[in-house]
Amino acid sequence: RSLYRRGFQRETLLELMTQAFYQPNIKLLKSRYEKNCRLLRKYPYCFQQDFPAFEELPLRFYPYDDQRYIPFTAETETFGEPLDLRHPVISRNFFQNLDKPVLAADVYSQYELEFLRDNVRKSEWVGRENHVYLHYTDWEIFCAYLQVLNLRPLLEEEKLVFLIGDEISQYPIDFQARFGIDYSRYP
């Protein structure tokens, strides 16, 4: 990667790295992507449904070791910094305004997504709308990360609401008006 960044035989190095690290993992990455797309198509609080084909995703993830990936942007042919999606660090304060449901932008860490799932009580338990709103500014980048995230455990309790781009204007959603769910009846 270092030689590649410096421009040393970029084409040859990219081909070697792709053959050694990316191609052996394409089947797994594609399978995970397709599984996550299927889950989101059935999920009631993901309103975008136009998932790009796997081959059209703007990022490829080259496994770095068992836990980390190096993202590669195909358009610019550049490698990013290594990512550890399970690194146990919370990068921001998700609970700044407790008067409204949590709103977090561009969360791509599996660890942070699981943290939000585990630390925000269900709307039924608090008697008011208390979902976690995840705002993703770029649909294609969000879709690219579906290759490396595991959404199944995150979606089971239906706590998450995915807002893409301009859908942020829907925050917070009136669940009673839109879905016929009155959380004030629950506790």
Where are these regions (language model features)?
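N-terminal donor/sugar-recognition subdomains of glycan-related enzymes
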Residues: S2-P187
